[in-house]
């Protein structure tokens, strides 16, 4: 590379995200181009090269399964009540679910709901994991 392009690259590395976004808009206006069209090509090429799997892994998980792993024997009734409250199951079904631990209690729920349910069950003596 030339000294001039090296200097430009070094300057670009110091930009914040907001400044970089503003720079892209200015370049689009000045040269009459769109960065969106070329970005789509880069994403498509990355997906074809196997980079898509890495990108998917980097995405934050949005749905969780709440799994009752185990519980303290002395806390069985409290765990049973917490499971009934969370699932709306009857006493017999909730009891069967708790006794079958490890068992999935809820599937595909939002992160906040999953964490709240995990906290509620752990507070009464259950051991819960989110998957």
Curated annotation (Swiss-Prot):
Q: Is Metal-binding among the key words of this record?
A: no
Q: What is the lineage of its organism?
A: Bacteria, Bacillati, Cyanobacteriota, Cyanophyceae, Synechococcales
What are the BP-aspect GO terms? Answer: translation
Q: What does this protein do?
A: Forms part of the ribosomal stalk which helps the ribosome interact with GTP-bound translation factors. Is thus essential for accurate translation.
Q: State the UniProt keywords alphabetically.
A: Ribonucleoprotein, Ribosomal protein
Pfam families attached to this UniProt entry = Ribosomal_L12, Ribosomal_L12_N
Molecular functions per Gene Ontology:
mRNA binding; structural constituent of ribosome
The cross-references to InterPro entries, in alphabetical order and at most eight, read: Ribosomal_bL12 (IPR000206), Ribosomal_bL12_C (IPR013823), Ribosomal_bL12_C/ClpS-like (IPR014719), Ribosomal_bL12_oligo (IPR008932), Ribosomal_bL12_oligo_N_sf (IPR036235)
Is Plastid there in the keyword field? Answer: no
Q: May I ask which residue range the UniProt record assigns to the signal sequence?
A: none
Q: Which Gene3D superfamilies match?
A: 3.30.1390.10, Single helix bin
* NCBIfam families noted in UniProt: L12
| Matches recorded under PANTHER family | 39S RIBOSOMAL PROTEIN L12, LARGE RIBOSOMAL SUBUNIT PROTEIN BL12M
Q: This chain belongs to which protein, by name?
A: Large ribosomal subunit protein bL12
In terms of superkingdom, the source organism counts as Bacteria
Query: Which family does the UniProt entry place this protein in?
Result: Belongs to the bacterial ribosomal protein bL12 family.
The record describes its quaternary structure and partners as:
Homodimer. Part of the ribosomal stalk of the 50S ribosomal subunit. Forms a multimeric L10(L12)X complex, where L10 forms an elongated spine to which 2 to 4 L12 dimers bind in a sequential fashion. Binds GTP-bound translation factors.
Of the GO CC terms on this record, one is: cytosolic large ribosomal subunit
């Amino acid at each position: 590379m030339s000294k001039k392009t090296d200097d430009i690259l070094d300057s670009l590395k110091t930009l914040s995200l907001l400044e970089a976004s503003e720079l892209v808009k200015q370049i689009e206006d000045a040269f009459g181009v769109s960065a969106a069209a070329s970005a789509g090509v880069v994403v498509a090429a990355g997906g074809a090269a196997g980079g898509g799997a890495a990108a998917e892994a980097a995405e934050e998980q949005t749905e969780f399964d709440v799994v009752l792993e185990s519980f303290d024997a002395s806390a069985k009734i409290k765990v049973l009540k917490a499971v009934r409250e969370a699932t709306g199951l009857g006493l017999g079904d909730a009891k069967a679910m708790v006794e079958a631990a490890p068992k999935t209690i809820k599937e595909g729920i939002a992160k906040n709901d999953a964490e709240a349910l995990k906290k509620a069950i752990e507070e009464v003596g259950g051991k819960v994991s989110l998957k």
